[in-house]
């Protein structure tokens, strides 16, 4: 649309004053006022010609104004005029927008390496308005200049071709759409862009992949950690868990499968229980010295998923540990002390251990009757235990040990029966056995804390029979308080 330039405009002039000044010359589309000048855009070119012819040199707000046709094109494409479709670059105050690209492009060859795109653009402005300039981007010593109009491009080609810029004669070549030069230039530009993009994308992908893998690792660790925390609430269970994890570390595939299966639902808890039983068989073999104790351990660990039986489970684990500790102590005593007293002590302890094992077996049986699901998993675990050859060897060793100990244990049985007949009734004998069981447990715990006090306590216990009676009475009362132990005694009596 035709635009009219107003020069020497008064600073007090407003849009209403300009509209009133141009009233009667046709339809005005836009009034754009600047500091000291302005532009008026008309709908028709003839109206603009009339306004320029008649109003040039007239007074507006006390000032004689200059009214001319606007020479340059619109610099801001804000208003919806026809010229804004050409895509002119914003300049002046509003120059911070992106440069607009046009089809009127010149290739500048033999460009000095010291000449930047800013210098080239400033130099080319003498031919016309430049919208885009670039130097040494696609190729070295070569630049690109884009003009607003075809006439500007032709003027630059005529006037500036062969002129010197920084001591070098530049050669201007029109960049036609079908020319090889443009294709190669555009290709090289697109290649460089695509390469940089692919590099960035690869980097970002690798970063995201590594972050994802680290996330998944941390998630699997946190899952397994939360699992172990929820299951091992007692200290004894957490210790056994840490031992299991140490033994699992050489077999990476198993640990991976376990960490993956941690996120799954609890419907697969039976399979997990079977896997745990197998792992317990592999881990617990060097530590467990009797097959019955080994079975009770594996059963109590397979029950660790059921939170209702936590208290009973703690008792069974601590019993198994106290039995192991007392076995080791009794063996070390029987080896170090050749006297008959130490032998009789170890024999009486082994007898008490046997009874404790029987009770733990009866407890586990009575519990397994109420829980049919855990019984199936235990049966599978016991079948697999019987299949494993290493467990058979250890069972044989345990049976050989028990056979070698059997004559000495029978002698200790006869002695203890004679003592119990002479001193106590049958009911007190049972409470004494329960008391001695508890003594062995409490001593095994105190032994781990204070080892030097062991022999003195055990001697005083065996010498004074009246002290053991009073202890057994007091401990039988405390045993009757705990529900799990009273249940196990009632099962063993029946």
From Swiss-Prot:
Extensively phosphorylated on serine residues in the RS domain. Residues 179-206, 214-246, 257-267, 286-302, 328-359, 367-382, 461-494 have a biased composition (Basic residues). GO terms for biological process: mRNA processing; mRNA splicing, via spliceosome; negative regulation of mRNA splicing, via spliceosome; response to insulin; RNA splicing; RNA splicing, via transesterification reactions. Residues 247-256, 268-278, 303-327, 411-431 have a biased composition (Basic and acidic residues). Residues 72-95, 169-494 are annotated as: Disordered. Residues 2-72, 104-177 form the RRM domain. GO terms for cellular component: nuclear speck; nucleoplasm; nucleus. InterPro entries: Nucleotide-bd_a/b_plait_sf, RBD_domain_sf, RRM2_SRSF4/6, RRM_dom, RRT5_SRSF_SR. The modification Phosphoserine is found at residues 78, 84, 288, 290, 292, 431, 446, 456, 458, 460. One of its GO terms (molecular function) is sequence-specific mRNA binding. Residues 449-460 have a biased composition (Low complexity). Pfam families: RRM_1. Keywords: mRNA processing, mRNA splicing, Nucleus, Phosphoprotein, Repeat, Repressor, RNA-binding. Found in a pre-mRNA splicing complex with SRSF4/SFRS4, SRSF5/SFRS5, SNRNP70, SNRPA1, SRRM1 and SRRM2. Interacts with PNN. Belongs to the splicing factor SR family. Plays a role in alternative splice site selection during pre-mRNA splicing. Represses the splicing of MAPT/Tau exon 10. PANTHER family: RNA RECOGNITION MOTIF RRM DOMAIN CONTAINING PROTEIN (PTHR23003), SERINE_ARGININE-RICH SPLICING FACTOR 4 (PTHR23003:SF45). This is Serine/arginine-rich splicing factor 4. It comes from Homo sapiens (Human).
